[in-house]
Amino acid sequence: MFIGHFGLALAAKRLAPRTSLGTLLFATEFADLIWPIFLLLGIEHVRVAPGITRMTPLDFYDYPISHSLLALAVCSAVIGGAYYLFTRYTAGAWAVALGIVSHWFLDVVMHRADMPLWPGGPRIGIGLWNSWTAGIAVEILTFTVGIWMYRDFTRPKDAVGRYAVWGLMTLVLFVWIGSLVSGPPPNEKVIACGALSMWIAVPWGWWADKHREIRGA
């Protein structure tokens, strides 16, 4: 799952109107944001294996911290709790906590059986990445519904608010399409550096959301 995580962050704005889109993006993308850091540190590993699934050539054989259900549940509780302590905003704390752990459940839908329940534990996955039609349909549906919900719930204050969010989502969409049509990456380091670039979504989302407001507020 890639663009679907962004769609969920957009939709979560309805659950927590006072929480910045940047924070919601950080939550739903948390696993993929820390993953490249662990790759570069040699804590987790991935290998290029063309043909392992139809939609991605990557073999996610070792990511027990960033992508196990137990680890993400712990991070969900800690970060969601910290958010509440700093803001006293219950809805926002729930949105952050659920956003973090949601990553695992969305990835299970797409991945083959490589999503660990806990570090070293059983791995599961429905495997929609083995079907171009089903995989693309689920990604686009989740992404599109999220965009519609965010657009229906918020309105721009100015030109930045009118274009910045959609600029970010357009970038994300093109990155996803590029990953589908380009050849396999040469090595793990290139994968990690490319994944690190998605950190830009967090400040971009915060900036864009500052220029929008809740409809009817």
Regions found by a protein language model. Name each.
Residues 1-217:
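N-terminal membrane-targeting hydrophobic helices
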